[in-house]
C-alpha cells in the first residue's frame, strides 16, 4: 500500500517519497510562548503527534523538530504587564506547554529549538540574503525584498497584485515601517533595537530577529537545507510559511520542503475562537472537565485538513466513543485468563486483515477517522462477546480470533496515541482495583459463603459492585467477573 499526502504546495495528493529511504525529517511551527495553550494548539499538536506516530509505525525513522518562538511583541507586552522579563515569561509558558502535552499524550519532539538559542544562525541567514540582494538595510532594520523572489505566493496561491499592503495581509493605515521599506510588501528579517526591549549585537547594530526568519534558520540548523515534511496550522500558510519559503529558497537555491501539510482550525459553537467573544478555551481548563482521551478522539474524528467545530454535543459523542474503546481495551484483561490468551501474539499483527484495513484507510492522506472506524468495529465486537461470555460461559467467536482482535485493538489504539496502559484505562473506567485485588475479594466471598456467612458474602459482592466490578455466579461454584 502507498501512503499519499495532500501537499498544500501542489494542491493535490501525492505519494510520500522521502529524500532518504526510510527516513523523514519533519518540522512543525510551534507556539509563541506568551500564554497558556488553547484548543487550537491542542488540535495542531495532537494531529502532528498522530502523524508522527503513524509514520513510525509504518517503519519510518522520523526526526521531528518543533520550535518555540520566544522573541515576540506579545511576550514583551506580557513581561511589561507582569513587571518581569521576556525570558521569565517564555520559560513559564514553555513549562506549562509540556504539562499540557503530557496530559494529552503528545510525545516530545526530538528537539525544541528556541529563537533566542538560534541567533547566530539567524544572523548568518540574514547576511546571506543581504549579500544575494534579497534583503536590504534601512535605519538599523533589515527587510526582505519580496519582489526579488519570483516564486513568492506559490504556497498560498496569492499574487502580489491581489494582496493588500503589508506582508501580513493587513492594511496598516499608519504603518510606522512604511517609510523604511522600499516596497509595502517587504517584511522585516531583523528589527532595530527599541528602548527597554531585549536586543542582541549584529552587523546591522543592536536588534532582534523578525518572526519569519526564526523558523527558516531553525529548520536549516536542525534538519538541513531541504526537509521532507513541513507542517503547521492552516492559518500559517500566509504569510508565515510563504515567507519561510521566500527566505530559505532565496538563500540556498533549494526547495525548503518536499511536502507542506496543514491542519484546519477549531471553531467553538460555529464561531472563531477568540478572547473577545468569550469562547477562548485553554487546554488546562478543558481537561478539568474532559478526559484527555475523549479530547483526542474529538480531534481525530474529523479529517485533519478540515475545520472542526467544538460543541457540547461533539464532545459528548467523543466521550461516549472513548467509553466504547475502553471496554474493548479491557477485554483481554477481563477475560483473557478464562479464554487462555497467550503471553504474546502468535504472529505479527501487521498481517491481520483488520490491521490492513486500518492502514488502507490512514494511508489515504492520514484519514484517521477511517482508521478509528476500524477500532470501534473491533471494540463493539469484543464488548458483545464479553457479554455473551459472562452470561453463557463461552463465546460465539473462537478465543484465538478474539485474542487477535483484542491485540490488534491495543496496538492500533497506541498508534493513535490513545491510552492503552491497563492501570490508566482501569482508572479511567472508574476503579483502581487490580485483577489480583479483585480475585482476592472473590476468594474471601467464596470462603464466607462456604461458611454460610451469606451477609458477608453479600457485603463483598456489593463492595465490588460499587467499584464497578460485576460478579456472575456460574454452575459448579465458579464465579466470573467483569468491569461495568
Swiss-Prot record:
Residue span of motif 'KMSKS' region: 272-276
Domain of life: Bacteria
Cofactor comment text: Binds 1 zinc ion per subunit.
Keywords per UniProt: Aminoacyl-tRNA synthetase, ATP-binding, Cytoplasm, Ligase, Metal-binding, Nucleotide-binding, Protein biosynthesis, Zinc
UniProt-listed Enzyme Commission number(s): 6.1.1.16
Coiled-coil ranges (or none): none
CC terms in the record's Gene Ontology section: cytosol
Entry's localization field: Cytoplasm
UniProt GO BP: cysteinyl-tRNA aminoacylation
Molecular function via GO: ATP binding; cysteine-tRNA ligase activity; zinc ion binding
List of residues binding ATP: 275
UniProt entry tagged with the keyword Magnesium: no
Cofactor(s) this protein requires: Zn(2+)
UniProt cross-references to InterPro entries, sorted A to Z: Cys-tRNA-ligase (IPR015803), Cys-tRNA-synt_Ia_DALR (IPR015273), Cys-tRNA/MSH_ligase (IPR024909), CysS_C (IPR056411), Rossmann-like_a/b/a_fold (IPR014729), tRNA-synt_1_cat_dom (IPR032678), tRNAsynth_Ia_anticodon-bd (IPR009080)
Placement of sequence motif 'HIGH' region: 31-41
Binding sites annotated in the UniProt record for Zn(2+): 29, 215, 240, 244
Catalytic activity: tRNA(Cys) + L-cysteine + ATP = L-cysteinyl-tRNA(Cys) + AMP + diphosphate
PANTHER family: CYSTEINE--TRNA LIGASE, CYTOPLASMIC, CYSTEINYL-TRNA SYNTHETASE
Family according to the record: Belongs to the class-I aminoacyl-tRNA synthetase family.
Assembly and oligomerization: Monomer.
The name this protein goes by in its record: Cysteine--tRNA ligase
Organism expressing this protein natively: Rippkaea orientalis (strain PCC 8801 / RF-1)
Organism taxonomic ancestry: Bacteria, Bacillati, Cyanobacteriota, Cyanophyceae, Oscillatoriophycideae
